[in-house]
């Protein structure tokens, strides 16, 4: 949803493609190779298939296509009338595809991206109202309490939006209903979080998103190492989970520091790095 919030409307297709190529697809190619190398060392030959991407990299490819998919928004009235029905139809039909097709999430999460682009800017003034912020805080606390107390009763695979209805043991009607419900609940919780962001910080979220891209991409090979090498060699998975949870905050802060960003910029932001290199 936040990824859609900072998309500029009415951008040309060519400009969107060039920007996405440099910001998303080039880092994807670099980290695709990095992830395959890590997987080959910690879990044997990695599984590679068309449509199936290493852990977490689906988001870069999906964001690239989301930006292209919304280029006609605001240009063609007929498209504006159809974009929401098509987005929701894609969300529902994506549940018919199997899990190995990880790019299915391009369709599953597109409504949230579209919501962030078209609806969130109009809601932001209302989200800043004091009573809305109080209600948002109550909602988030209640959500944490409910999830904590009923954690064993929930199937969290629904949150991934990548499993088919058959894999989740549902028919099309009930599966589609649950998929829509999960998407709606996720947007409501995300709105609650946005409403609690101080107003003076809203303008800096786009820049913050640029820095968090470092944390997102750099955590992927580390996560693969933990999942495929560390956990199978540890007697207590709970101990690993607690340790990782405690270490994740300092890890994120470290990888977002300027020295780490400078060191890894050629991988994460190759275009910006190329611009910074002095021309002889």
What kind of region is each of these model predictions?
Residues 1-280:
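Alpha-helical transmembrane segments and their immediate juxtamembrane cytosolic regions
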């Amino acid at each position: 949803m936040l990824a859609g919030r900072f998309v500029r409307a009415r951008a040309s297709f060519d400009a969107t493609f060039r920007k996405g190529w440099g910001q998303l697809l080039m880092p994807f190619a670099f980290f695709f190779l990095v992830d395959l190398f890590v997987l080959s060392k910690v879990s044997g030959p990695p599984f590679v298939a068309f449509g199936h991407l290493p852990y977490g990299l689906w988001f870069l490819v999906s964001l690239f296509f989301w930006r292209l998919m919304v280029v006609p928004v605001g240009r063609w009235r007929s498209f504006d009338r159809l974009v929401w029905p098509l987005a929701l139809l894609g969300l529902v039909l994506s549940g018919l595809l199997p899990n190995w097709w990880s790019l299915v999430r391009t369709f599953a999460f597109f409504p949230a991206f579209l919501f962030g682009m078209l609806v969130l800017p109009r809601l932001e003034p209302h989200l800043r109202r004091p009573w809305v912020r109080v209600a948002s805080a109550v909602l988030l606390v209640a959500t944490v309490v409910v999830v904590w107390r009923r954690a064993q009763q929930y199937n969290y695979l629904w949150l991934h939006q990548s499993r088919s209805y058959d894999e989740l043991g549902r028919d099309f009607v009930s599966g589609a209903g649950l998929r829509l419900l999960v998407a709606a609940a996720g947007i409501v919780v995300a709105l609650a979080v946005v409403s609690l962001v101080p107003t003076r910080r809203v303008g800096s979220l786009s820049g913050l998103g640029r820095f968090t891209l470092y944390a997102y991409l750099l955590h992927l090979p580390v996560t693969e190492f933990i999942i495929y090498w560390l956990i199978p060699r540890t007697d207590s998975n709970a101990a690993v989970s607690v340790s990782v949870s405690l270490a994740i905050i300092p890890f994120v802060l470290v990888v977002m520091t300027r020295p780490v960003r400078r060191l890894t910029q050629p991988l994460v932001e190759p275009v910006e790095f190329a611009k910074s290199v002095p021309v002889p």
